[in-house]
Amino acid sequence: RILKAMMAIKGIYGEYGVQVLNHGVGFDTSAIELILPTYGESLGLRGKICRHWVLNPHPTMIPAIETGWAENLYSFGSEVGMEEYIKARPDVFAIGPDGTMRSNRAFCQAAGHYAADMFVGSTMQIDRYGNSSTATKNNVAGFGGAPNMGCDAKGRRHVTEAWFKCGNEVANRAELTGECLRGKKLVVQVITTISEKGFPGFVQELDAIQLKKNAGLDLEPVMIYSDDLTHIVSEIGIAYLHKCCNMEERMNAIRAIAGKTEVGMLEDPAETLRLRKEGIVKLPEDLGIDRSTATRELLAAKNMKDLVDWSGGLYNPPAKFRN
């Protein structure tokens, strides 16, 4: 997860200059948040990326807030145990006259559509085309706001560097809008090729397709559709899907980072080399990242007590997270 976080920060956040973003909940995004003050700082990116967040007050954001990375967070809702820390940082959180945080789920969803440069979240399965879902035969997990956060709002006209750069990298943009320029929201899925329990992350067909049939649903429970997804980050590397000219090239890019899964077994090494030369696939070495440096030493906080210390004793973790 730390290696994936390093690749994401250098190969996506830094490359596109992402200023406004939303993170899903999970270990992958927590790893990114926790290495901003260390690895991100070593790249000289503070003040250049990750300044404004549409995000619940994640405890793993405390080190980034305390080191001046996150300038403000506007939240969908709160987080148990963060009340006193939030109250002490009215410069970062939206605090009302009574000293408590003002959150608004609807405003956050709108901001996710039209203000955020990027959505980053974890997923359980990605199929050979790039469709993503957390609904599997072993675990039907809800999507939360991911379908809203993880889609490209066609009504957006607010230009930012990251949005504009991504849109101008879309391979078939001239076929879609002719001479007119358009941006595109960065939609990033982070995944492990094989989970700790042995379940493959990359599959030929989503379990969601069979779930639709079994449950008599009108639509497969797909969390993020392939045409909205711009990047996939696995421990193998990054696939820049929006740069692909057609579905076949997209499928080859996915195979290149799918590891020892049924999708990854179909990888063509010669095609992967071509995609790397084109900048459509990037491995850690392409990004100048030494895999051996991806260690827990990069985490600004290595346990819950560290987070409490970073907060000046204001974060009060729920009992189940204490040890």
Put a short name on every predicted segment.
Residues 1-23, 27-55, 59-323:
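Conserved phosphate- and dinucleotide-binding cores of soluble alpha/beta proteins
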